[in-house]
Amino acid sequence: LELVDLRYDKAARISDQSFSNYLIKYVFVDQKVIPLSKMIEEGFFINQERTVVACNILLQVFADENVHKYVKEQIDIVWNHLKNSKEKFTPFLKAFYLIRPTETLVLLSDFIESEPARMFDVGTIKFEKNKSEKNIEDDAIKILCGFKATQQTSEAIELLLLYYKKRPDLFYEIYSALAVHFGVDIDSERQGYFVQERVVEQLCKAIESNQTTNLLLLFIRVAAQFLKLSFSR
């Protein structure tokens, strides 16, 4: 891990990962040599990847409730400071959306609501199986995929379907989100197929509420993927 000296913009590589993890905690949490919120806000726009890695180390490596609480409080400070600047807040939200899951879903709901509806007949698409894991480029869909196996799974799926109603032209990306990212994986059996049940549940609910050809086609494709007996992950 590279620790970045924000003041002088110099980097030092520390080879021992355990010591590196300890040093991050010692500097930013124990001694608070530099306020963690300052490191996050300034470091994020210097080296986003390394800043996120440092925060993840504090949240995931150290099983300390006080550390977790402090880190989340510091991220909240940056969140509040940046949220009125769309240019800076958007990339920050994409990196730290799970710190404020409810607020993130509200923001995405507002975004989807403001999106103009686009007319598109999904039936005109020649479905290609090799596109089932199409790369997702849409930021809203990417973030919603991150809510798999969380307390907000159902809400995230519901928003994906609302987005699909507005943007059927994003069929492949939304199909990929539901069938692949929310699909069967190595943890599904242990979790009682909770995520996949929520996908089917929300699809059925959407169809019952407003049955359209586009929704039916999405349901058919997702169901076909779920009914496969093998999976790759």
Predicted regions and their residues:
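C-terminal leucine-rich, beta-strand-based interaction scaffolds used for sensing/assembly
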Residues: 1-106, 117
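Amphipathic alpha-helical elements of HEAT/ARM-like alpha-solenoid repeat scaffolds that form extended
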Residues: 46-65, 85-111, 120-162, 169-204, ...
